[in-house]
Each structure stands twice: as C-alpha cells, then as structure tokens.
Amino acid sequence: MGPVTDQNGYNGCVGWTWLDLLNSPLMAGNRRRWNASHTPARFTTAYLRNDVGLEIYKLATRADEFPWTYPPRDDGSSGLGGAKALKAAGVIDAYQWTFDFANLLAWGQRQPLALGTLWTDVMSDPDRDGVIHIGTERQLKQADADGEGHEYSLIGCNWPKKLGRIRNHWTEDWGLKGEALIPLDELETLVMSYKGDVCVPTLAAA
C-alpha cells in the first residue's frame, strides 16, 4: 500500500485517503499519471509524498458540494470531491459508487476503495489486536447527530474471519502500523444504516 501517511491535524482525510489509494500497487498507473504532470521525473510510478495529500484536499474542496474551500476554511471535503478532482486532473478515468454491501465486499477483494462513514470516538482506539469497533447504538447516534465522519481506505476483506482491513493516515503509531481491522457486520452498519459512501475508482494500466 505504500508508506503510511499523516494528515497532520488537517480536516483533509479525503485528500490523504486518495493519496493512500494512489500509492497502492494496483493504482500504479494512476500514480504515474499524477507524476506525469506534477514532478520533474515524468512517467515514474514513484510513491507520492505525504504533502500530496494536502494538495488533493485543496482540489477536492474546489470540486465538492460544500460552499467552502481550503484554504482558507479547513472544514473538510467529501469522497465525491476527491473523485471529481482526480477525474478532472486526468488521474482517474472514472469512478463509481456501490450502495450494496455485497458489492462492497466483492470490490474490496479486488482493489482498494475509498470509504466515507460515520466515525465514533471509540473507533479511534484499536484494541491490542488492531481491531476497531463502532460502539453502542447511543454512541453511533451521538456521532451522527454531531456530524462526525471520516474518510479512509478499505484495502482488503478476510471473509473467513469476517474482517475488513482499513488504512488510515494517522502515522504508523495508530493500530497495526497505520492500519486496523473492523468486523464486517459493524462496517455494514456504518455503510448501510448510517449511509456511508463507497467509491470505486477505475484502475489505469500500469
């Protein structure tokens, strides 16, 4: 998946999620496209630096559905904003959404996905095995009322163990060196009951 990134306290989880996706092996062709227009060494598949997350965040705020942009307002963006920005830049040719959990599982076993879901306080603290839980119904409803959300990558599904693996952008100090496991039934609750979004970017040829 490339180096673990750090969103550095910005509300730019969207930008760093798309950075993580672009640094994944399956998106090497898309990464090459970014490098072709942003680095002196064109047509390389070298990993993108951490500060690219901030650049994508800025672009996303200009393409999303919200009435602000960063800078000056660091109020976040959306998965749609990130996808539209990278499509406009020619980094991805297309993207689609999946609104069915079975489709999420199917895609999640084929390529990394961008997830935007409710994020409760307890999800920030993986247990000793790197597993996160979404908390109680009361905690979920409180997070929903407070508008607490987060964008992150789904990088795999272990169907026998009923676990999804996610990549965050809070340094290697978080979870399993920047990643965590989430029970699939709890992920389904976030996506289906609390209207999470699941973006599937089109992979470019490497």
Per-range role (PLM):
Residues 1-206:
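Catalytic-core signature of thiol
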